[in-house]
């Protein structure tokens, strides 16, 4: 990795009452742009959630700027690195929720599950009385998860409450352990489950990313790679970039064995979207792929000037 061009990727969130969140949008965006930072930050009445990338100095400056607000002074973040900028632009968006469960009455500022550190996680999920639930979407679970974890097979986090209502019983499932990418979805999910009468609800502090950062591979109960929402696609232990790519057509993460499928055609289809492609859709996708390659070839040529 070229140290001079290394991008620091910082992910952070905090559930905290921000009644003035709309007033923070413009000055925060201006400061990030001045620091040559790219990424996305979400602001809502319930808190802040963001992933940004830039130089070491710029990231430190933005985090200091955020923490200057006393409500965010203990804002925690996780870091990883990227060889190239993982984001194309900087956005600061106003939202109803910083992670969308679709139930505004669920408030992690009022109640939340018990945090479990990465060092304590293996022992917890090895307990046969504990049901372990991956709160992420099905396409994320597809490329990696913890041993023995349940996959709710959701397409959206909004689907999670219905999964709980249909499949879990507070009287039967006494101990529940949950995890997600960085921890934010589990804050909402654990708050929801407590409201449904589940007594012992645990979640992985810092999420999968903190676990992969702190737990060595030889001690790990993680299997596969962890999907991330930027151009790295996936990361492994030590938060090093993984090997997965995205299908250009449907966006599903693909391993090398997925690309060996007869239904895979670069830029056109994979086994997850092949059956949904009509001849008309295939023709449009071929043109879309051609335009993408043309654009990239022009960009590459300009970079050599």
UniProtKB/Swiss-Prot annotation:
Keywords linked to the UniProt accession: Oxidoreductase, tRNA processing
Keyword check for tRNA processing: yes
Gene Ontology terms, MF aspect: oxidoreductase activity, acting on paired donors, with incorporation or reduction of molecular oxygen
The keyword RNA-binding appears for this protein: no
All copies of domain Rhodanese, residue ranges: 126-220
Enzymatic reactions: uridine(34) in tRNA + AH2 + O2 = 5-hydroxyuridine(34) in tRNA + A + H2O
Biological process, per Gene Ontology: tRNA modification
Enzyme class: oxidoreductase
Catalytic site positions: 180
PANTHER family per record: RHODANESE-LIKE DOMAIN-CONTAINING PROTEIN 7-RELATED, THIOSULFATE SULFURTRANSFERASE/RHODANESE-LIKE DOMAIN-CONTAINING PROTEIN 2
Protein's job: Catalyzes oxygen-dependent 5-hydroxyuridine (ho5U) modification at position 34 in tRNAs.
Protein name, UniProt field: tRNA uridine(34) hydroxylase
Gene that produces this protein: trhO
């Amino acid at each position: 990795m070229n140290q001079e061009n290394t991008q620091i990727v910082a992910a952070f969130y905090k559930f905290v009452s921000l009644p003035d969140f709309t007033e923070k949008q413009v000055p925060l965006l201006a400061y990030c742009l001045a620091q040559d930072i790219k990424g996305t930050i979400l602001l809502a009445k319930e808190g802040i959630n963001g992933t940004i990338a830039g130089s070491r100095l710029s990231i430190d400056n933005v985090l200091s700027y955020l923490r200057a607000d006393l409500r965010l002074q203990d804002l925690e973040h996780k870091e990883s690195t990227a060889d190239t900028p993982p984001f194309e632009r900087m956005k600061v968006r106003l939202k109803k929720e910083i992670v969308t469960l679709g139930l505004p009455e669920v408030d992690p500022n009022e109640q939340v599950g018990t945090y479990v550190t990465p060092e304590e996680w293996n022992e917890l999920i090895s307990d046969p009385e504990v049901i372990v639930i991956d709160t992420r979407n099905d396409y994320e679970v597809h490329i990696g998860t913890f041993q023995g974890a349940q996959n709710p097979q959701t397409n959206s986090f909004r689907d999670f409450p219905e999964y709980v209502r249909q499949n879990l019983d507070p009287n039967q499932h006494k101990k529940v352990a949950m995890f997600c990418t960085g921890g934010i979805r589990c804050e909402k999910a654990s708050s929801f489950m407590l409201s449904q009468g589940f007594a012992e609800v645990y979640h992985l502090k810092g999420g999968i990313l903190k676990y992969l950062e702190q737990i060595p591979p030889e001690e790990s109960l993680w299997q596969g790679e962890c999907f991330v929402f930027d151009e790295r696609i996936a990361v492994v232990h030590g938060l090093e970039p993984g090997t997965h790519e995205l299908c250009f057509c449907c966006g599903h993460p693909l391993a090398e064995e997925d690309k060996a499928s007869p239904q895979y055609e670069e830029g056109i289809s994979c086994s997850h979207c092949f059956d949904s492609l009509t001849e008309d859709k295939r023709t449009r996708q071929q043109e879309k792929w051609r335009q993408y390659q043309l654009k990239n070839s022009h960009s590459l040529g300009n970079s050599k000037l």
